């Protein structure tokens, strides 16, 4: 019996030195690639000063970045350009969840968009457009609450098949 256990143990030990080779899994991309705003949440806090946990250097320049995402594949092989425009009609008859507060387009005097396009570089899946806030933004107390949004809309795309759309 002890001999059998020794042989089984020896066989197990020898088998452990033989291994299968693991190669990288390669999957094909989905049938089409899309772009979309990945996070549509009405509150973005701008934190001025130093933060030991997060890089808030953009905040300290009185800026934020509105991000777009690319999906439908494992690797973005193209430079993707998304055309955008501010569309205040997106806010019509829209209220913040759990309140009677209407979603109000931010006055255009409160900010400047760096461009009317969002670029997602080849090899990346996220890109953004910077928003520079003016002194008027910081002077308005309503900016401290869920009140204003920048109703940015994707209007066209080059380098991807379509803009992913849904209902609010």
Give the ranges of each region predicted by the language model.
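Sec-dependent signal peptide recognition
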Residues: 3-10
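Intrinsically disordered, low-complexity sequence elements enriched in Ser/Thr/Gly/Pro
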Residues: 1-2, 42
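C-terminal motif of bacterial Sec signal peptides marking the signal peptidase cleavage site
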Residues: 16-19
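Acidic/polar, low-complexity intrinsically disordered N-terminal segments immediately downstream
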Residues: 21-109, 113, 124-127, 137-138, ...
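Conserved interaction-surface patches within small, structured recognition/assembly domains
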Residues: 114-120
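Short Pro-Gly-centered flexible turn/kink motifs
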Residues: 120-132
């Amino acid at each position: 019996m002890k001999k059998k256990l020794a042989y089984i143990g020896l066989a197990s030990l020898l088998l452990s030195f033989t291994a299968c080779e693991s190669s990288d899994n390669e999957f094909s991309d989905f049938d089409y690639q899309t772009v979309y705003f990945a996070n549509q949440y009405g509150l973005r806090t701008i934190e001025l000063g130093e933060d030991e946990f997060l890089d808030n250097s953009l905040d300290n320049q009185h800026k934020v970045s509105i991000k777009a995402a690319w999906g439908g594949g494992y690797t973005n092989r193209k430079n993707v350009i998304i055309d955008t425009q501010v569309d205040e009609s997106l806010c019509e008859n829209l209220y913040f969840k759990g309140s009677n507060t209407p979603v109000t387009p931010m006055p255009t005097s409160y900010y400047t968009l760096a461009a009317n396009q969002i670029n997602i570089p080849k090899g990346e899946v996220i890109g953004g457009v910077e928003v520079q806030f003016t002194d008027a933004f910081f002077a308005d107390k309503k900016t401290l609450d869920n009140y204003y949004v920048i109703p940015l809309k994707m209007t066209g795309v080059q380098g991807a098949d379509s803009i992913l759309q849904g209902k609010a």
